[in-house]
């Protein structure tokens, strides 16, 4: 019996989630991947339902087409383990491994962990799982200005930051708590220095704009900032305008670096306060 797990092609060559196709016998209960987690040293923890045995594993680097070896070590299952869907079961119903690259992987560099495992019935699961190199030197940002409202193009809502500590932006996350459909923006890999100004533009509404991944990169657009490093959100629609909270975190589940609460003029008026956003 054979089971294949393939990744759909996306803008970076691979989708965020693998697509599984199963071809199994009627009596087979094939092993399945129930959870994965990339660690700070770029090791990937893989959890399987059932008893799994590794047949092969390697790291593929899409940007260069190169492959790297990785070590495979069995892991104990935590007593409080839950899978990616929040389900739990008896510890002895799972198998876990830590797969560690044997060569360094750059901060934010895409890589694919691929390989094969088998179960006790000799069914085979081939997998290809996309990740990005861990940010071991995250920069620290502080919010200095926010413009959550604009009424006319090409003006785009923005958040301005100052870099408090030098490092890399890779994975640093802006969480728009009020937007249930598109709550997160993650910065791409870019080295920044303490004292630099960073501007995140909420929307991409002009031609010629691009992320300023280096200090020498210059973005087009009437709203780009000559004295700052510009980054552009993938959205075209206006962000939520009700009372809202913006969080800056070192990764979706990382530590909070800064936060801000804002309200519309109507919301302020309800509370007996007066404040208006000027469209300037």
Please give the residue ranges for each predicted region:
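Short edge beta-strand/loop segments characteristic of extracellular beta-sandwich folds
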Residues: 45-49, 160-162
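Short, surface-exposed alpha-helix to beta-strand junction/turn motifs within ectodomains of secreted
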Residues: 53-76, 172
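Solvent-exposed beta-edge/loop recognition patches
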Residues: 106-107, 189, 194-280
């Amino acid at each position: 019996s054979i089971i294949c797990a393939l990744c759909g092609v996306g803008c970076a060559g691979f989708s965020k989630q693998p697509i599984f196709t199963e071809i199994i016998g009627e009596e087979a209960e094939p092993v399945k991947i129930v959870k994965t987690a990339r660690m700070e040293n770029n090791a990937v923890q893989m959890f399987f339902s059932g008893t799994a045995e590794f047949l092969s594993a390697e790291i593929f680097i899409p940007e260069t087409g190169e492959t790297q070896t990785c070590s495979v070590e069995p892991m104990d299952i935590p007593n409080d383990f839950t899978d990616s869907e929040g389900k739990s079961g008896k510890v002895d119903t799972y198998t876990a491994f830590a797969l560690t690259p044997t060569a360094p992987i750059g901060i934010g560099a895409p890589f694919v962990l691929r390989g094969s495992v088998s179960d006790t019935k000799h069914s085979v699961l081939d997998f290809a799982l996309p990740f990005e190199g861990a940010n071991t030197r995250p920069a620290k940002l502080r919010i200095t200005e926010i413009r959550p409202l604009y009424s006319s193009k090409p003006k785009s809502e923005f958040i301005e930051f100052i870099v408090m500590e030098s490092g890399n932006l890779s994975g640093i996350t802006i969480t728009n708590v009020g937007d249930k459909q598109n709550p997160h923006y993650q910065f791409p890999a870019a080295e920044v220095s303490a004292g630099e100004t960073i501007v995140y533009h909420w929307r991409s509404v002009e031609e010629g704009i691009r992320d300023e991944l280096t200090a020498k990169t210059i973005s087009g657009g009437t709203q780009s900032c000559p004295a700052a490093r510009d980054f552009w959100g993938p959205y075209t629609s206006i962000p939520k305008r009700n009372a809202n909270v913006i969080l800056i975190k070192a990764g979706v589940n990382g530590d909070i670096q800064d936060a801000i609460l804002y309200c519309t003029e109507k919301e302020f008026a309800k509370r007996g306060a007066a404040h208006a956003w000027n469209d300037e």
